[in-house]
Regions:
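A conserved glycine-rich beta-strand in the N-terminal activation segment of trypsin-fold
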Residues: 21-22, 39-57, 63, 82-84, ...
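C-terminal cap/linker of serine protease catalytic domains
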Residues: 22-26, 108, 180-245, 250
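Conserved active-site neighborhood of the chymotrypsin/trypsin-like protease fold
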Residues: 55-125, 132-136, 151
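Short coil/turn linking the two alpha-helices of tandem helical-hairpin repeats
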Residues: 239-241, 274-276, 303, 308-315
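Flexible, gly/ser-rich surface segments that form the specificity/activation loops bordering the active-site cleft
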Residues: 21, 25, 108-154, 158-165, ...
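TPR alpha-solenoid repeat register
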Residues: 230-232, 264, 298
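Short coil turns that delineate tetratricopeptide repeat
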Residues: 259-260, 293-294
Length: 316
């Protein structure tokens, strides 16, 4: 663990074409950058890298390869605060992106995502992860922009950047983030590439995500979809694939996202009943009754649970 914390707080020196003076927004932007260590189930380190927060709720972006096969991950912010990654929000293996959320009860510093795609030959700044040895932005230009998905940019920058710039944000003059530096195609590449952060922010799970091989290659719990109908589909498809503790957490997340719906409580009551936690099951059925508009449906669900319970051998 000491090795992991050391890597998180002391990333290697980064080289590049540094500006003579950082823009006025640099210090604030640097606080949103994070160092990341991914681990296996035993807590052994798999990989280390960097990324950055894109909203105050602890949502961040990094490269997908960094999280592949990981069971756990920890991050340290530019302010020196340590967080645990609690959920994977979405992925794109095609664009080597992962969107994830850390566990926090306070606002996190975050970069502002530009609503512009940017224009060719626009001056930009590349922000390396700040260290004592390297606290300066890198000057660059948007040499070319390829549009994808109708409104997002895949950027070619004017000069090559070291691999240690991977996942660094590409900022415009106003201090808003346009892109994230991508992995080099080959060691002799004379340019660098960045993918739209606005596109990365569109990555979410959906009802069919439990069958997504790219998501399943990351063994960290997934964030639930935003739509309740999608959550029900996700839970149905996840039930046989997830460990009981993970599935229980999904049910807790469901109740937290939709506290005024009776469905998360009846589903969690079913789970508790199946695992012999009858007091918790009764508590959830009462909670479902409190919020239900159609109370007859809750009575039916409860009676069904009691019937199934009485069919169990040895139950009296």
């Amino acid at each position: 663990m000491k090795k992991i914390i050391f890597i998180l707080t002391c990333l290697s020196t980064l080289g590049g074409h540094l500006v003579a003076q950082n823009p006025k927004w640099f210090k604030k932007a640097a606080k949103a950058q994070i160092s990341i260590v991914t681990m296996n189930e035993k807590g052994d380190m798999l990989q280390s890298g960097s990324g950055f927060f894109i909203d105050k709720n602890g949502t961040a972006l990094a490269d997908y390869q960094l999280f592949k096969q990981a069971s756990k991950a920890k991050v340290v912010s530019g302010e020196g605060k340590e967080y645990e990654v609690e959920a994977i929000v979405g992925v794109s293996s095609l664009y080597d992106l992962v969107k994830f959320r850390v566990k926090t009860d306070k606002d996190t510093p975050a970069l502002t995502i530009s609503d512009r795609m940017g224009v060719k030959h626009e001056h930009v700044y590349v922000l390396p992860y700040p260290t004592k040895e390297n606290k300066m932005c890198v000057n660059d230009t948007l040499h070319d922009i390829q549009k994808f998905n109708e409104k997002y940019g895949y950027y070619t920058l004017g000069r090559p950047l070291d691999e240690k710039y991977l996942n660094s944000p590409v900022m415009d003059e106003e201090g808003e983030v346009l892109g994230m530096i991508q992995r080099k195609a080959n060691a002799s590449a004379t340019t660098s590439y960045a993918v739209s952060v606005a596109y990365g922010n569109t990555l979410f799970t959906n009802g069919m995500s439990s069958a997504d091989n790219d998501l399943n290659a990351i063994h960290i719990r997934k964030a639930l979809p935003a739509d309740e109908a999608d959550i029900r589909t996700f839970l149905f498809m996840t039930a046989s694939r997830s460990a009981s503790t993970t599935y229980n957490q999904y049910l807790n997340d469901y109740a937290e996202q939709f506290p005024k719906s009776s469905e998360p409580y009846t589903q969690r009551a079913d789970f508790y009943m199946a695992h012999g936690n009858y007091a918790a099951a009764e508590e959830d059925m009462n909670a479902a009754m409190d919020v239900a508009e159609k109370k007859d449906e809750v009575y039916y669900a409860f009676s069904k649970l009691l019937y199934e319970l009485n069919l169990k051998p040895g139950y009296t």
